[in-house]
From Swiss-Prot:
This protein's UniProt keywords: Cell cycle, Cell division, Cytoplasm, Kelch repeat, Repeat
Domain of life: Eukaryota
GO cellular component, one term: cytoplasm
SMART domains (alphabetical): Kelch
Function recorded in the entry: Involved in pinching off the separated nuclei at the cleavage furrow and in cytokinesis. Required for mitotic integrity and maintenance of chromosomal stability. Protects cells against mitotic errors, centrosomal amplification, micronucleus formation and aneuploidy. Plays a key role of midbody function involving abscission of the daughter cells during cytokinesis and appropriate chromosomal and nuclear segregation into the daughter cells.
GO terms, biological process: mitotic cytokinetic process; mitotic nuclear division; nuclear chromosome segregation
Location(s), subcellular: Cytoplasm; Midbody
Ranges occupied by Kelch repeats: 1-31, 32-79, 81-127, 128-175, 176-222, 224-281, 282-329, 331-354
A Pfam family hit: Kelch_KLHDC2_KLHL20_DRC7
Origin species: Rattus norvegicus (Rat)
Protein name stated in the entry: Kelch domain-containing protein 8B
Primary subcellular site in the record, as a coarse category: cytoplasm
Length: 354
C-alpha cells in the first residue's frame, strides 16, 4: 500500500556509532546492524567492526576485520556476512574476501577475488553471491563477473559485462541483475545492462539520457529511477564545469525505454552524493551535497501514485557520502561526512511500519 504525504514518514535516531566513519560497509542480520571498516578521522581505512542491537539500542564491538578496508561490498549469507574487495591503507584495491561468523563472533578468510578490486557491486540470489565490475590496481575499470559458491569456497567466472565500470548500482528483479551507471576513472558511465541468471547472457538496454556523476538510483514497481547528480559539461549544455542538477529519469522495464521527466516533476532540491531508496510506494532522496556550502539535511519523496514530489521531515544530521541500507520499513543512513566523518545512525521510517 502506498504511503502518502510527509506525515507518513518519521526519523528514528539511534545511538551514535562508537567509531565515526565514512565509506563504511553495512549489513543487517537477525536484528543487528553491522558496520564494518570504512575511513576514520585520519582518512585511513579501519579494521573496526561494530554492531547495533536493534532491540536494546546498544552498540557492541566485534572482532576486527583481518584486512582493514573502506568501500567494500557486503552480502549476508545465512549466519555469515561476506565482505568483498575495497581499498586498503595505501589506497590500493584489495582481493581479500572475509566472512564474519555471527554465531561464533569471529572472522574467517575466504577464497580471494581473482583480481584485486574496489567498487565491486554484489548481489545475493539463492545462496550464490554475484560480484560485478570494480576498479583494479591499475585504476582501469573491470568487466569481470564472478559467482561465489560458498560450499566449495570458490569464485567462478561468468560472461563479462559489456561495459567495464566500478561503483555501479545493481538491482535484482526476477531472474535478472540490472547494472546501471558507475564510473570509468573520473567519468560517469551511462550504460544500462542486464544479466540473465538463467541463460547467463547480457542484454544492453538504452543508455541513460544524461551523463551525471554521483547520481542516486532506485528501483520500484517495475521502474528504475536515476536522480540528481553532477551534470557533466557537454555539447548540449552551456556549462563549462560540472554542476548540481535535480534531473529525474525513469526507465520502464516493461516497455524498455527511458523517460526524462519534465521540469515540473524534477526534484525540489539539486543534489548529488545522496541516499536514495524506496519506501511505501515512494522514491526518497536524502541529504547529499548541493549548491550550499555544507551538506544538505533536506529530504523529499516522489509518490509513484500521485506523480509528484513532497518535502519530508529533514534528516536530523545533515550529511553526504553516507552508507545506507534498507531493512523492512526503515531506510538507514549511516556515518558519512558532516564536518568530518560522522557517527550518526538514523533511519527514515514509515510510521505505520515501526
Amino acid at each position: 500500500m502506498a504511503a502518502g504525504g510527509g506525515q507518513a514518514f518519521a526519523w528514528q535516531v539511534f545511538p551514535p556509532m562508537p567509531t565515526c566513519r565514512v565509506y563504511g560497509t553495512v549489513a543487517h542480520q537477525d536484528g543487528h546492524l553491522l558496520v564494518l571498516g570504512g575511513c576514520g578521522r585520519a582518512g585511513l581505512p579501519l579494521d573496526t567492526a561494530e554492531t547495533l542491537d536493534m532491540a536494546s539500542h546498544t552498540w557492541l564491538a566485534l572482532a576486527p576485520l583481518p584486512t582493514a578496508r573502506a568501500g567494500a561490498a557486503a552480502v549476508v549469507l545465512g549466519k555469515q556476512v561476506l565482505v568483498v574487495g575495497g581499498v586498503d591503507e595505501v589506497q590500493s584495491p584489495v582481493a581479500a574476501v572475509e566472512a564474519f561468523l555471527a554465531d561464533e563472533g569471529r572472522w574467517e578468510r575466504r577464497a580471494t577475488l581473482p583480481q584485486a578490486a574496489m567498487g565491486v557491486a554484489t548481489v545475493e540470489r539463492d545462496g550464490m553471491v554475484y560480484a560485478l565490475g570494480g576498479m583494479g590496481p591499475d585504476t582501469a575499470p573491470q568487466a569481470q563477473v564472478l559467482v561465489y559458491e560458498s560450499r566449495r569456497d570458490r569464485w567462478l567466472s561468468l560472461p563479462s559485462m559489456p561495459t567495464p565500470c566500478y561503483g555501479a548500482s545493481t538491482f535484482l528483479h526476477g531472474n535478472k541483475i540490472y547494472v546501471l551507471g558507475g564510473r570509468q576513472g573520473k567519468l560517469p558511465v551511462t550504460a544500462f545492462e542486464a544479466f540473465d541468471l538463467e541463460t547467463r547472457t547480457w542484454t544492453r538496454h538504452p543508455s541513460l539520457p544524461s551523463r551525471r556523476a554521483f547520481a542516486g538510483c532506485a528501483m520500484a514497481e517495475g521502474s528504475v529511477f536515476s536522480l540528481g547528480g553532477l551534470q557533466q559539461p557537454g555539447p548540449h549544455n552551456f556549462y563549462s564545469r560540472p554542476h548540481f542538477v535535480n534531473t529525474v529519469e525513469m526507465f520502464d522495464l516493461e516497455h524498455g525505454s527511458w523517460t526524462k521527466l519534465p521540469r515540473s516533476l524534477r526534484m525540489r532540491d539539486k543534489r548529488a552524493d545522496f541516499v536514495v531508496g524506496s519506501l511505501g510506494g515512494n522514491i526518497v532522496a536524502i541529504g547529499g551535497l548541493g549548491n550550499q556550502p555544507c551538506p544538505l539535511a533536506s529530504v523529499e519523496s516522489f509518490s509513484l501514485a500521485r506523480r509528484r514530489w513532497e518535502a519530508l521531515p529533514a534528516m536530523p544530521t545533515a550529511r553526504c557520502s553516507c552508507s545506507s541500507l534498507q531493512a523492512g520499513p526503515r531506510l538507514f543512513v549511516i556515518g558519512g561526512v558532516a564536518q568530518g566523518p560522522s557517527q550518526a545512525v538514523e533511519a527514515l521510517c514509515l510510521r505505520d511500519g515501526v
